[in-house]
Amino acid sequence: MDNEIIIIVIVIIIFFFYLKQKKLTNCETQVVKVQKDIDEINLKLKKLNK
């Protein structure tokens, strides 16, 4: 019984994330990529400064 509930919850979560990603437009995904790149650059700069 417990295992079935856990599996159902996991499937719902995965489905939810899938739907969220489907709704993202190309523009939004590009912005997210740019933000990730900026975060990586900031991390590298912080490491250099230390």
From Swiss-Prot:
It is found in: Membrane. The chain crosses the membrane at residues 5-19. Keywords: Coiled coil, Membrane, Transmembrane, Transmembrane helix. GO terms for cellular component: membrane. It is a single-pass membrane protein. Its main location: membrane. Residues 19-50 form a coiled coil. This is Uncharacterized protein 083L. It comes from Invertebrate iridescent virus 6.
